[in-house]
Every structure is written in C-alpha cells, then in structure tokens.
C-alpha cells in the first residue's frame, strides 16, 4: 500500500540545462537511505511542463532503475491531452513504475463527464494503479467527489488521490464516497498532519526533497497515533513548507537542495532563480529544521 512520505522529486539539470542523470540517481539513492516511503518523478516539482516527452520517459526509466523496487515509484503521467496521457501511462508501466500519478487536465477545462472520460481511458490502457491528482489551483478545474467515486467504483486500478485542494473537509467526503480503502495523500505539506488525522495516509511531498527523514518520521508518528511527536516534527518543518513556495515552485526547493549540496539549483524558464531575500528565508527555515548547520 502507498503510505507515508512520498517525495515529489526535483529533476536536476547540468550547467547546459540538460538532465543531470548522475545527480538525479545519486539524489534518489540518498532519498532511500534517508528512509523515504516512496518517490514520484516528473510531476510539477520535477518540472514536467518544461520537459519533453522523451525527457519525461528518460527520468522515469532512471528512477525505476535506481530504486530497484526498494520503495514504490509513482510516475507522473499527466497531460491535458488524453492520448498523450495514455502514451505516458503505458510507458510508465512498461518501464516498471509501481503506479502513476495523473493530474486533471489543465487549461482546456473539461467538465465532469470529460474528466471521467479522460481517466477511464487511462485506466483501461494499463494494469498498474492510477492515483488521481486533483489540484484546482493549477489545473483550474476541481474533480467532484462524485466523479471520483464513479471512477474508483468502475475501475479497480484507480486506487487513490493526491488531494491538493487544501480543503481539509474533502478527506472525509472522499472517504465517505470512495471508501476507507481509497488512498488519500495530501498534496500540501502544510496540511499533511491534519490531513492524516481526517483519514489520509500520507503526503506526496515537496519538502521531503530536502527533509526525507523528518517527513517520513512525521507520518510514521501519525500512523502509530503519536500526535505529540508528529506535532513537534510539523513545527520543525512548517517554516520550510511555507518558504519553498514564496516564489513559484520548484525554484525554492531546488535552491534548498543546492544549499545542502544535493544537486544544482538550475530551473527551466519560465521559472526563474530566487530573489536574495527569499534565499535568506529558506536558509533560516533550513536552520530551524536542523538541516543546515552553518
């Protein structure tokens, strides 16, 4: 079962702007040694909007090979074109991903029937599990709980949701409509603690790019009912959770990773490097979490 802290992996680039394969593989290995519960390549944090389809496939293949079945790999396979999403999903399955993460189609704004058609086409095309990624703030559409219910009832491999609505009440609604076994993962580190308390089972996390151990420990504490420890860890992480989103992501989390010597900070346009004032806030957040000692 997919559970705990799952890192929405950044994609390191070299000085020429190409994917830095060595840095990426080393980063994935570090994540595993730190105790992360799963990894999710080529999502928003992995800069999928500015990766070519071939680059997206390249990163998924690298990730699957490096992980070698030690933790689940949830490959990003979203597109606002159904046929493209099907192609990416089929590639992820062929590459050996354990599941796929599929964002609701962005920009073209389908209605609920269109959302059902999109996800059903993907589910029919593969046998591995599908996680719905519902993020109205970026896609401009919100999948209704009833549509989610219909999809998970009609397709056995649609097993859960990454919920980035920031509406904590949705957890209970989705639990009621989709069942207790429907996997609900927060898409927002800032509300992950409360999300778990309402019935969630983890988070597809941005902060865990630099704090995998702390994030995994937070969720483990939730699952054993130790909310006192979970709250202490949440307090350590909260400034970081906020700081890395002061400017458009993933510039903030890539800067934090570079500050810790994990990889370079280069982002692809139209995302741009951070202002110096933002860097100082992230530095302070890293200190607060005990991740930066200098």
Swiss-Prot record:
SMART domains given in the database record: DHDPS
PROSITE patterns for the chain: DHDPS_2 (PS00666)
Biological process, per Gene Ontology: diaminopimelate biosynthetic process; lysine biosynthetic process via diaminopimelate
Active site: 133, 162
Pathway: Amino-acid biosynthesis; L-lysine biosynthesis via DAP pathway; (S)-tetrahydrodipicolinate from L-aspartate: step 3/4
Catalysed reactions listed for this entry: L-aspartate 4-semialdehyde + pyruvate = (2S,4S)-4-hydroxy-2,3,4,5-tetrahydrodipicolinate + H2O + H(+)
Family label: Belongs to the DapA family.
UniProt function note: Catalyzes the condensation of (S)-aspartate-beta-semialdehyde [(S)-ASA] and pyruvate to 4-hydroxy-tetrahydrodipicolinate (HTPA).
Assembly with partners or alone: Homotetramer; dimer of dimers.
Protein name stated in the entry: 4-hydroxy-tetrahydrodipicolinate synthase
